[in-house]
């Protein structure tokens, strides 16, 4: 009877892991890998941009709307854009052909940067870390280079995916409150400065979480729709008082804009978490401190 050493047996039984992919890829990289077995490509949008996908997308790409497919249902009085249950996300991913050996590339159309980074965060949360990438420049960069596009939706075979949720990527109000004075943790507000400074509000309280730094989400991507260089991003983080080695916890209004700053933090090598409830959650808790209000 043939026997295998325990180490080889465990390796044989372990789920297949695709080689790690860079979190940010170029159009050249995607063109070179577009026909790889196991590659799943998503054009990110919503109901307003579905028509764009129907008329033009990267060949083989599927349409993904994170605001509806990767979120809890919208209910009056409930928090918006919260992560749904793992089983719900697993069902969505499998229906789109995602399996344990898949490698995923996300790209924006019409500069939908924050929904794209939110989708990236969700996939990382589900345990796909190291196998998910964002296409730098999105559909616009792909088309500008004269690369092929299609209007044909791909035929998708359901996948089999085993989720490994990473709860450590998600922060809640309790975590944020407990680390407001922690020098090893930096809370970062990703909203426009008008909200950070308290001139505008969406959630009934003006200002920002006490002690939070400001890195507006608009500063992460340049006017051409590509991510700023690591040196530029690091300089912006440093200017906001964020130090190397700190854990970065990002928030915004509902957890979407914050995902773009979270992604940038990950690119720079920071340990990063996203406060999923964000200011919509913090502001409704009267006992939690807010500062920066303007008269």
Description of each model-found segment:
Residues 20-48, 60-66:
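Mature N-terminal segment immediately following signal peptide/propeptide cleavage
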Residues 36-40, 59, 100-103, 183-186, ...:
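Loop/turn elements at helix/coil->beta-strand transitions in domains of secreted/extracellular proteins
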Residues 19-26, 32, 72, 139-210, ...:
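Active-site neighborhoods of enzymes that stabilize oxyanions during catalysis
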Residues 233-235, 240-295:
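C-terminal soluble interaction/assembly domains
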Residues 80-175, 179, 200, 257-273, ...:
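Thiolate-centered catalytic microenvironments shared by cysteine-dependent enzyme domains
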Residues 2-19:
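Hydrophobic h-region of N-terminal signal peptides that target proteins for export
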Residues 46-49, 67-71, 110-114, 139-141, ...:
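Solvent-exposed loop/turn segments at secondary-structure junctions
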Residues 73-102, 217-248:
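Helix-loop module immediately N-terminal to the HCX5R catalytic loop
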């Amino acid at each position: 009877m043939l026997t295998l050493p325990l180490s080889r047996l465990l390796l044989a039984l372990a789920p297949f892991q695709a080689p790690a992919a860079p979190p940010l890829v170029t159009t050249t990289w995607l063109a070179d890998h577009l026909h790889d077995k196991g590659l799943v490509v998503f054009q990110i949008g919503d109901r307003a941009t579905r028509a764009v996908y129907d008329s033009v997308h990267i060949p083989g790409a599927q349409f993904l709307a994170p605001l509806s497919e990767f979120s809890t249902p919208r209910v009056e009085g409930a928090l918006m854009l919260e992560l749904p249950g793992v089983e719900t996300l697993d069902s969505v991913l499998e229906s789109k052909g995602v399996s344990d050996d898949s490698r995923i590339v996300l790209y924006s159309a019409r500069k939908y940067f924050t929904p794209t980074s939110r989708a990236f965060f969700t996939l990382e949360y589900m345990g796909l870390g190291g196998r998910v990438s964002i296409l730098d420049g999105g559909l616009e960069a792909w088309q500008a280079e004269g690369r092929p596009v299609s209007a044909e939706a791909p035929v998708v075979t359901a996948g089999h995916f085993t989720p490994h949720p990473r709860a450590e990527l998600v922060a809640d109000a309790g975590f944020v409150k407990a680390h407001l004075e922690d020098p090893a943790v930096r809370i970062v507000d990703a909203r426009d400065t008008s909200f950070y400074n308290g001139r505008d509000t969406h959630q009934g309280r003006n200002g920002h979480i006490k002690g939070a730094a400001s890195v507006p989400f608009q500063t992460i991507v340049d006017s051409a729709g590509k991510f700023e260089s690591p040196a530029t991003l690091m300089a912006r983080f440093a200017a906001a008082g964020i130090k190397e080695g700190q854990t970065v916890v990002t928030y915004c209004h509902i957890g979407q804009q914050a995902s773009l700053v979270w992604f940038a933090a990950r690119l720079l090598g920071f340990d990063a978490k996203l406060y999923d409830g964000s200011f919509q959650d913090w502001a409704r808790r009267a006992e939690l401190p807010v500062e920066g209000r303007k008269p």
